[in-house]
Amino acid sequence: MKVTYYGHACFSVQVADKTLLFDPFITGNELAKAIDVKTVAADYIFISHGHADHVADAATIAKRTGATIVSNYEVTVWFNQQGLPKTHALNHGGGWRFDFGHVKFVNAVHSSSLPDGTYGGNPGGFVIESAEGNFYYSGDTALTMDMKLIGESTRLTFAALCIGDNFTMGIDDAIKAAEFVRCHEILGLHYNTFPPIRIDPPSSDREIQSRTSALTPVAAR
């Protein structure tokens, strides 16, 4: 698997000759201004919930690439209404086998509404299993005991966890989440994009490295 980080909560994973893109928010992210969204590849776009900083570039990328949008029912219906019929709806606890592997939609503790105020259903995360490895994307969430179920059922290669605090887990809770899912290869997400989620990267890195192994993704260009 090849992991590419685009900033905020957006990253992609190449697995089984497919590119899985998560929560695309690039054009509105000042920290990602060097990235040309027209070059971002996707065969599938996974949306954890409806907030603008997770869906902003999804429609643009889906129209250009023909990618399938995977999310909860309410979010996929919203994209259908935006003229994007190529979607796959999941709901909590449900899974589906795609051409690259199996995806399960799991619980997240957060809120969700679409940019126009439409109800976004319940937020979630994704557990993806493939022949090349397994990983968990938490989406925006608080620390939750449900994460222990992931560790009991799936041997993870890495976990992508929010660490920015204020709106989601902070560093300490993310480290506890890593313990819950029994994975210590961690990709930290959802930090430094806005003032409320600013953290001190050097001290945060030291804290994470002292208790887990931080995953170093390929830098997006």
Where are these regions (language model features)?
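Zn-dependent metallo-beta-lactamase
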Residues: 1-19, 26-30, 97, 104, ...
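Active-site environment of divalent metal-dependent phosphoester hydrolases
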Residues: 28-29, 51-56, 76-79, 94-97, ...
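Pre-active-site segment of Zn-dependent metallo-hydrolases
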Residues: 12-51, 56-63, 111-117, 141-153
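Active-site-proximal loop/helix segments of hydrolase catalytic cores
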Residues: 114-179
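Binuclear metal-ion centers of metallo-dependent hydrolases, dominated by the metallo-beta-lactamase
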Residues: 68, 80-94, 175, 179-221
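Active-site HxH/HxHxD metal-binding segment of metal-dependent hydrolases
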Residues: 33-112
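Short active-site oxyanion
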Residues: 1-2, 63-68, 133-135
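Active-site neighborhood of phospho(di)ester-bond hydrolases with catalytic His/Asp-centered motifs
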Residues: 21-23, 42-50, 70-73, 136-141, ...
